[in-house]
Amino acid sequence: MIIRLVTYHAIDGKDVERWMQTSASELRSVKGMRHLEFVRSKINPSQFGAIMHFRTIEDLDNYKSKESGTYQKLVRSVRETWMDNTKPVNEQVFEILDI
């Protein structure tokens, strides 16, 4: 199982949770995605993110390439409307180990 964690900072005064609610079903229906959770930092409430679960790294790669229309549309929506572009966006990809 592969987990992708993406975090970013919201623009002050923007209702990012509303964007998450309106985009959740579209994101969850993307081929290859097993599970999706949205998160907000308890330490810095302007920091939001998404935790995406994929079965394999190939599913994640397909999400970014073959599903690029949906993926790019959602990324563009976040960047243009909700995200503070002066602060960093972080992406981390993890593999769950069978230990």
Tell me what each language-model feature is:
Residues 18-22, 66:
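Long, highly charged amphipathic alpha-helices
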Residues 24-25, 36-38, 51-52:
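Hydrophobic/aromatic beta-strand elements that line small-molecule binding cavities or substrate pockets
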